[in-house]
Amino acid sequence: IVYGFLQFDRSVGQTKQTLFTLGLMLLFLIPKFLIVVPLLLEDFYRLGKGIFNYVQHKPTPTFLPERRRFISQVALGLAAIPFGSLIYGMTKGKYNFKVIKQTVFFDDLPEAFNGFKIIQISDVHSGSFDNKEKIEYAIDLINQQEADMMLFTGDIVNSLASEMHPWIDTFRKIKSFSYGKYAVLGNHDYGEYLDWKGNKNAKAQNFEEIKQLYG
């Protein structure tokens, strides 16, 4: 983890190495936090009880009562939940594509829009991809919806237009829609999370290339 952070360079952007390092850090810290909190609360209780026994002159083998095994087991159980979830998210979860269907009703909706279907996708973050087969499955899933219109609501990359280059041919397999495809830029598409070392021309060129990806 330390090596990963030492190697982090904002001028390079979010590489697979930096994302992996971030995942390891969360994997290390979040479960540890869930272990520490209940144990720390129990320690406050033990300290209070120890002080109470001391003030009351109650004879005890030790000043602090022994830690209860049940509390330790509960803490470990709590820590196992995010640990398992993070492992799943880092390996399988990012490709767990799902279709969520939502029927929208409007009293004043023209009859011509009855049954009109819009498919909306978002936050592709192509720089995080490493499995072509899974992405092709996602494209097939989009095409299977038989929608009338497609909306893409931003973040096609993490920062750099080049992140999308290996996936352009795959995304071109998205079929045409009767009422077209529409998109807006996301916050990551502006390249603001990258250190451009003051090179405004490179930043502007990258932004133009990202806009062309949307074309």
Predicted regions and their residues:
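Non-catalytic terminal accessory segments
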Residues: 1-95
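Short, mixed-charge, low-aromatic patches
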Residues: 2-5, 59-62, 90-99, 122-130, ...
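Soluble catalytic domains of enzymes that build or remodel membrane lipids, polysaccharides, and related
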Residues: 109-215
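C-terminal segment of N-terminal export signals and the immediately downstream linker at the start
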Residues: 52, 84-119, 129-133, 140
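Residue-identity detector for glutamine
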Residues: 7, 14-17, 56, 73, ...
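Short, well-ordered turn and helix-capping elements at secondary-structure junctions
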Residues: 25, 74, 103-108, 125
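Short, flexible coil/linker segments at or flanking structured domains
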Residues: 12, 16, 58, 85-92, ...
